[in-house]
Regions:
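Exported/periplasmic cell-wall-interacting domains
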Residues: 16, 71-156
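Bacterial N-terminal signal peptides
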Residues: 1-7
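Well-ordered beta-strand positions in beta-sheet-rich domains
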Residues: 20, 41-43, 66, 105, ...
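N-terminal post-signal-peptidase region of extra-cytosolic proteins
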Residues: 12-19, 26, 46-71, 89-94, ...
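Short Gly/aromatic-enriched secondary-structure transition segments
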Residues: 37-49
Length: 156
């Protein structure tokens, strides 16, 4: 039996605005949350070196810590993207103390347009330079749920 009210509730649940994004690097998962509850979870691809905190530009690592998703870019080279405010002040101080450049331009973005793999297959591999990648279809969902200013926590 089809229940239209349940279909509408389910669809609106995945497009409602979220108040936190959590990335669990060890599980290769991005979860969107509202009021402390997971709304939806996605399999992600990350940098070629997925373990450890990003220390410097070019290290192929995805940063760890608390950041802000500070702006959206609809004309990204990887479909659409949402910018992560890396480096934060702590990251900058660490890099300065080590005499290195912290890097930047870390994003949540869509698929690699040059990949010959089907989107879900490509998500099984870490292929970014430190960004967090989802499929284009998933990026469309995230685009609707995430506003600029939403916090993101990236866990080891």
């Amino acid at each position: 039996m089809f229940c239209p009210l349940l279909a509408v509730a389910s669809a609106s649940q995945t497009t409602a605005k979220v108040d936190l994004v959590v990335v669990n690097k060890s599980e290769s998962r991005l979860s969107v949350m509202r009021d402390g509850k997971v709304i939806k979870s996605y399999l992600i691809a990350m940098g070629d070196v997925p373990s450890g905190h990003k220390l410097k530009e070019g290290d192929q690592r995805t940063p760890q810590g608390r950041y802000i998703l500070d702006y959206k870019k609809s004309d990204s080279a990887f479909y659409k993207s949402i910018h992560i405010s890396y480096p934060n002040e702590e990251d900058k101080l660490r890099a300065d103390a080590l005499g290195i450049r912290a890097g930047g331009m870390i994003m949540i973005h869509g698929e690699n347009p040059r990949s010959s793999l089907p989107p879900k297959e490509a998500q099984k591999y870490n292929w970014t330079n430190g960004c967090i990648a989802v499929t284009n279809k998933e990026m469309d969902e995230l685009w609707k749920m995430i506003d600029a200013g939403t916090p993101i926590e990236i866990w080891p």
